[in-house]
Amino acid sequence: MNQKKQLLVNTIIIAIGKLSTQVVSFLLLPLYTSKLSPAEYGTYDFLVTLSTFLLPIITLLMEESMFRFLIDADDLKSKKRVITDTIAYTLVGTFIFTAIAGIIMGVMHYEYAFVFILFIISNILLGLSNALARGTGKIKLYSFSNFILGASTIVLNIIFIVSLKLGVSGLLWANTVANSATAIIILLKLHLPQFVSRKDFHKSTLREMLRYSVPLVPNNLSWIIISLSDRLMLTAMSGTEANGIYSIANKFPNIIYTCYGFFSTAWKESAAKILKDDNKVKYYNSIYKDIKFFLKAIVLGLIAIMPFVFSLFVDESYNDAYMYIPILVISIYYTNMSNFYGGIFTAYKNTKIMGSTTVAAAIINIVINIIFIPKFGIYAASFSTLISNLIVFVYRRYKLKEYIVLKEKFNYVFWILLVATLITYYKNNLIANIIMFIIVLAYCIFTNMSFLKKIAEPVINKFKK
């Protein structure tokens, strides 16, 4: 199977599993918004965002390094060396974090200290096991594990939030147990002990892996800072209720991020494997064209359908979130395209540029938030995120020319439709929204028809085997 078909197959297999977690996220929205006040949900969302900020610091993203180095590992001995070094470093990092966090939160007498620490440890374990499954080529196991994660999250959330009425701590406990159980299943299926041995620990390999992963940390942290600064400053300047509304508004644009995530997981591997191929420029351009059309279709489709589905998922106390969704949807588009460019930088093992661009964007995001949130509230947070993501997109696009030239063609029809869709969205006239949705649907199908055909054949053949 050629590289492009393999990428499509892996993307779909990953999507089948990961889609369950996104479906879960939306199935649970009515539960969250009915059982938790905007202030409570804002607190939970802040803790989740804080955990994503701490994770790269604790692990130095060694799981990402492990995945990349496993792609180049030609024999079992090389794989054992990479995996052993990763696990050894992760265990040390986790122990140090637990000790420091336990002391700090113990002194502060923070209400959610214990479960929050366990929540972070469970995320470390899950990230490590997922990277191991992907790196060893067990894509179906990776996909299946995400399905297990989604199903267990539903059950546990109902138990902890509805039956036990534990509120914010219940959400944290549910996710902690689901993450841990899923990670254990993956590690048992992979027979982890066969890949880990004290004699296979090599400092030289560890240093090489850290040289790859450490520059990724500022990149990841900066993306998180863009999100965290919004939430932190909204909480400080406008209250936890405003943060809760902003968090719900972000739930819908995250559909796009999740859809791209299906592709991105497979793309990092594919972009690296084809690097030595003479046809890599043609391959990159072909994928670039397809992913742009696909993401633009989702942007238009999500904005067009939102007037009809928003009230089905969200309690009326969160109605203000409706106004910010289009801004965040467009912002996520630029995030995803920046990540696409990042996949190429990763293939060339140039991770430094990824960090420098996002650090600059994070600083701009913070400055905008400080200046404008006191006056414009959630709108300021939304636009600061859009501006920051756009800056990363433009700069990475410029720097990419040093490695590869991607062909560009301005899509006038898309931008005209986007403006028209935004007008009907905010006018919120039923007839106009219906007409606009039909037009957008036709456009999305027409522009992605060949892409959908490319997906269907290899995926069907893969599962027949």
Tell me what each language-model feature is.
Residues Y425-K465:
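Membrane-proximal transmembrane or re-entrant/amphipathic helices at the cytosolic face
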Residues M1-Q3, F114, K140, L164, ...:
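Interhelical loop/hinge segments that connect adjacent transmembrane helices in multipass membrane
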Residues F144-L192, V359-I364, I378-Y398, L441-C444:
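Hydrophobic alpha-helical transmembrane segments
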Residues K4-E63, T98, F119, L149-I154, ...:
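Signature of the first transmembrane helix
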Residues F69, N123-N146, V329-A360, L400-E402:
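Membrane-interface junctions at transmembrane-helix termini in multi-pass inner-membrane proteins
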Residues I58-T59, E64, T84-V115, I184-I185, ...:
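Alpha-helical transmembrane segments of multi-pass membrane transport and lipid-handling proteins
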Residues N10-S25, L149, L171-I186, L190, ...:
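Transmembrane helical elements of multi-pass membrane transporters/channels
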Residues P30, I58-D74, P253-K289, G342-A347:
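Helix-loop junctions and terminal segments of transmembrane helices
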